C-alpha cells in the first residue's frame, strides 16, 4: 500500500506498518438527512456520523468491528470472519470527509447507477 499525507506523513506510514492497518476496516456514507450533527465535535464517534451540507464519508484503516456482523456475533468464528472480509488489527483510525461527492455503482449488467449525490442517497 502506498500512502501520502500533507502533514504527519511519517505518523501515517508508521500506523499502516502495523499488521492489518494497511487495509480498510470500515467504510460509510452518511446521508445529511439522517444526522443532526452539523459541525465537527472533535470526537470521532460523533464526527464520523456528521451530516452537514454534503453528509460525509468516512473510511477506517485497520480493524473491522465484528459487532457489525448481521448474524449472531457470538457464533462468528475467526475463519468465517476472515472469509467475509473482516480485518483484524490493533489499529482502527477513522478518516472523515465532508466534501461534496457523487457515488456511482457499477452493476453486473455493465450499467451504472448513481446511489449518492449532494449528500443524500438517491435510490
What residue ranges belong to the model's regions?
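Metal/cofactor-centered catalytic core regions of large enzymes
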Residues: 1-123
Amino acid at each position: 500500500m502506498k500512502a501520502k499525507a500533507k502533514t504527519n506523513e511519517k505518523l501515517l506510514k508508521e500506523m499502516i506498518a502495523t499488521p492489518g492497518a494497511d487495509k480498510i476496516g470500515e467504510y460509510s456514507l452518511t446521508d445529511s438527512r439522517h444526522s443532526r450533527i452539523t459541525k465537527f465535535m472533535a470526537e470521532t464517534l460523533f464526527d464520523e456520523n456528521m451530516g452537514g451540507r454534503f453528509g460525509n464519508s468516512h473510511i477506517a484503516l485497520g480493524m473491522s468491528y465484528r459487532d457489525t456482523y448481521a448474524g449472531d456475533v457470538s457464533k462468528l468464528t475467526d475463519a468465517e470472519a476472515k472469509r467475509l472480509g473482516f480485518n483484524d488489527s490493533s489499529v482502527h483510525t477513522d478518516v472523515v470527509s465532508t466534501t461534496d461527492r457523487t457515488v456511482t455503482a457499477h452493476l453486473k449488467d455493465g450499467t451504472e447507477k448513481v446511489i449518492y449525490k449532494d449528500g443524500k442517497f438517491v435510490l
